[in-house]
Amino acid sequence: MIARDDITGLILAGGRGSRMGGTDKGLQPLRGTPMAMHTMMRLTPQTGALMINANRNLAAYESFGVPVVTDSVPDFAGPLAGMLAGLEQCQTGWMVTAPCDSPFLPADLVPRLAQAIEAEGAELAIPVTVDTDGRRQLQPVFCLMPVSMLDDLIAYLNGGGRKIETWATSHRLAEVLFDDAGAFANINTLDELRTHEAG
């Protein structure tokens, strides 16, 4: 079994926040607490260490008390660039990622992904949910991976790849079904944020 202490959680807060008017999503308050802090509080009991990937407002993220890593690939190259930055700095054998705007992520996310990797002999694990139409939805931004994937990810990015799902599905992938699709909801707009504030 992959030990909790051998897993570092990486909160992905390095994006432009373009669907939120360019604001830094991770620092937007939800019920009085920055969204990235909600995600951090969800991941803390499931991992041995935490990091945040951010490319602006670094002092604000550093005030959360965990290491902050910036993209080594320029121009906000997307979540994979954040994953790369995390893998480059990770001090444990495994890393799990979650976006900063996922304050409801499951309390058993990491142990279930780790269990699936062990059971299936997989390289990576990501959650799968089922939408209201019965379609399976991969949630690839939530990904448990070994740090040994670093060179492979560098090669994928150097080849122009930018989609997490394409990269993940090119490996032995454990897809783990979670019943609560709402737990993986991203808060992408200010309207969605207001809805969750009221909820």
Swiss-Prot record:
Keyword Aminoacyl-tRNA synthetase in annotation: no
Q: Which residues bind GTP?
A: 12-14, 25, 53, 71, 101
Subcellular location as annotated: Cytoplasm
Please give the Gene Ontology molecular function terms for this protein.
GTP binding; metal ion binding; molybdenum cofactor guanylyltransferase activity
- What family does the database annotate? Belongs to the MobA family.
| UniProt function note | Transfers a GMP moiety from GTP to Mo-molybdopterin (Mo-MPT) cofactor (Moco or molybdenum cofactor) to form Mo-molybdopterin guanine dinucleotide (Mo-MGD) cofactor.
Subunit details: Monomer.
Q: Could you tell me what this protein is called?
A: Molybdenum cofactor guanylyltransferase
Report the source organism: Cupriavidus pinatubonensis (strain JMP 134 / LMG 1197)
Query: Organism classification, top ranks?
Result: Bacteria, Pseudomonadati, Pseudomonadota, Betaproteobacteria, Burkholderiales
